[in-house]
Amino acid sequence: MSTLVFIEFNKNVISESSSQAATIANDLQNEVYGLTSKDDETYISSLGSKGFDKIFVIDNFNHYSAIEEIIKSNGIKTILSPSSNTFKELSSRISTQLNFPIASNVLKIEKNGKISCSIFSGKAESHMINDNDSCIYLLNKNIVESQDFDKKVDIIKVDSKVSENSSFEVLEQKLIEEDISLNDADVVISAGRGLKGPENWQMIEDLAKKLNAATACSKPVSDAGWRPHHEHVGQTGLKISPKIYFAIGISGAIQHLAGVNSSKTIIVINNDPEAPFFKAADYGIVGDAFEIVPKILNSLG
């Protein structure tokens, strides 16, 4: 039996989320296949160390028909995926076309088909039995530690060119420039409307550089155009699980908490002592961010 893992990369390095998915696939004692759009044979050939037996290389994750053919022709019944926006969209398409059920916010998969999932914005867990012979699992990050393996990987390049008769057309592609991937960052500095405007974001950028962190924002900030949409974390944005999450000037609505509540440590800075975020915080500072953040920067040198 084979398991397919969707592979994402961060600056030529396989993401930690994809490495963890490969570890889970090996724990299920299945043959582990990977799917990637990164055509770099030198690097891909090293992915045996991450637990992959075979890698399928396609031009683009938007070439759905080619991906569906890979799944059908190889008898793949189990798909493990990081919970990124790209793979959520891809998984929804595959689910519809191939009649695969989807389990989201997955915390644990057992060999007997039992699945544990995070529900109610991380406040509870649901336990289910999958009696179907196929399933797509959208995995929460950091549910296992990724492991190294001694495997040699086979590389298969798939002809996924769109035919001339296809209605599919790529109009534009934009590269998101990030110093550190938000999905894989150990430390995330996030800010909200408490910063009062985009002109005050420099101190957030400065703190992120000092701590080798990624930057993020709340939905209202993204909606207002203060920060790019790909930095939005929350129920309708990215769901992240860093080791440390700073929430600066964010009230802590349940929709935002849904995207960050699996962070190992949450530090809140807010001038409102009644801000809901303090209830979810491991550490909290009541005060003006415009006074506190510069003091933190000064203490870091």
What are these regions (language model features)?
Residues 1-301:
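N-terminal glycine-rich FAD/FM-binding segment characteristic of electron-transfer flavoproteins
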